[in-house]
Amino acid sequence: NSLHSAFSTYGEVLESKIILDRETQRSRGFGFVTFSTEEAMRSAIEGMNGKELDGRNITVNEAQSRGGRGGGGGGGYGGGRGGGGGYGRRDGGGGGYGGGGGGYGGGRGGYGGGGYGGGGGGYGGGSRGGGGYGNSDGNWRN
């Protein structure tokens, strides 16, 4: 996908995921990218901040880790409807935020709680191949 292609320029991308709305299956305006190294993550932050992706200007930064472990960097981006959004980067599996909401993703090897504003949804990333999205009633799916 375009997210993977745009960021693979900066290093090995382990996973890229665009978060979809549960009801409409349309993009919620943000996603996550996980790199194999922190160096690749930092290069992508510098190279992509303020750039256009799929017709939207994105903001790129490192997201806050919640008890994250060491390891590869990653992140998420938000294009947002109406030009909003943010790009969250995670270091060692922290989390990301995007759109007008906020929220934290899980780290590698576990779930880190959090929510995405405006509708009570939550997003939790899992191990490298995992990750999931769901609403606040605790029903999660990949």
Swiss-Prot record:
Annotated TM spans: none
Comp. bias (Gly residues): 67-101
Record PROSITE patterns: RRM (PS50102)
Any Pfam family matching the protein: RRM_1
Family matches, as InterPro entries: Nucleotide-bd_a/b_plait_sf (IPR012677), RBD_domain_sf (IPR035979), RRM_dom (IPR000504), SLIRP/GR-RBP-like (IPR052462)
UniProt keyword terms in alphabetical order: RNA-binding
GO molecular-function term, one example from the UniProt record: RNA binding
Acyltransferase is among the record's keywords: no
Region (Disordered): 48-101
Residues covered by the RRM domain: 1-65
Cited Gene3D superfamilies: 3.30.70.330
Classification via PANTHER family: HETEROGENEOUS NUCLEAR RIBONUCLEOPROTEIN 87F-RELATED (PTHR48027)
Functional description taken from the UniProt entry: Possibly has a role in RNA transcription or processing during stress.
Protein name per UniProt: Glycine-rich RNA-binding protein 1
The species this protein was found in: Sorghum bicolor (Sorghum)
Lineage of source species: Eukaryota, Viridiplantae, Streptophyta, Embryophyta, Tracheophyta
